[in-house]
């Protein structure tokens, strides 16, 4: 199920993410991706309280892979918008993408402890709630005009640059 259906869901989510990125502005795309990924954790919580079934497992895998791929495409679009300096684009992108891995690297070890202490249902509810700071950050960036500033075209380098 994971390799067949999961791969298909990831590919479909990647295409859907591309359509979202092209069809919506970056601010709206970021909100959509954040809420979809937050919601996909609740699908895991639902699975934790349902009787074991291949249908539910398939649904959870499709939901996670589809929303994860959308989030990845939108995140890459956001990083690309941030990295607009013609002189340092590759360096900026490498540093930002490496920084994005910090959370999943350091949170994975204590996550097992939390799951053992709370059970799978509450673990996934808590993991959903951990997205709230990201939503607050998105709101803060939006209130400061961050996304509008990224959307403004930047000039090309001149001889003085």
Stretches with model-predicted labels:
Residues 1-10, 56, 91-95:
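Loop-to-transmembrane helix entry
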Residues 126-158:
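Multi-pass alpha-helical transporter architecture, strongest
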Residues 7-15, 105:
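Residue-level signature of mid-helix packing/kink "hotspots" within the transmembrane helices
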Residues 110-133:
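A membrane-interface helix-boundary motif in multi-pass transporters
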Residues 35-52, 139:
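C-terminal ends and interior cores of transmembrane alpha-helices
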Residues 12-31, 115-116:
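Helix-to-loop junctions at the C-terminal end of transmembrane segments
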Residues 69-85:
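Intracellular juxtamembrane helix-capping segments at the cytosolic ends
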Residues 86-116:
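A late C-terminal transmembrane helix in Major Facilitator Superfamily
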């Amino acid at each position: 199920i994971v390799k067949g259906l999961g791969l298909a869901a990831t590919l479909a989510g990647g295409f859907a993410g591309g359509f979202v990125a092209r069809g919506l502005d970056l601010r709206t795309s970021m909100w959509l991706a954040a809420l979809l990924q937050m919601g996909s954790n609740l699908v895991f919580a639902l699975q934790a309280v349902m009787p074991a079934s291949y249908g539910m497992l398939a649904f959870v895998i499709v939901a996670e892979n589809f929303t994860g791929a959308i989030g990845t495409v939108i995140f890459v679009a956001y990083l690309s918008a941030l990295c607009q300096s013609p002189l340092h684009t590759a360096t900026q992108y490498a540093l930002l993408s490496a920084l994005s891995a910090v959370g999943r690297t350091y949170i994975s070890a204590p996550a097992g402890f939390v799951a053992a202490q709370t059970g799978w249902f509450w673990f996934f509810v808590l993991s959903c709630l951990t997205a709230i700071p990201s939503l607050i950050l998105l709101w803060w960036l939006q209130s400061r005009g961050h996304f509008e500033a990224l959307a403004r075209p930047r000039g090309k380098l001149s001889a003085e640059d």
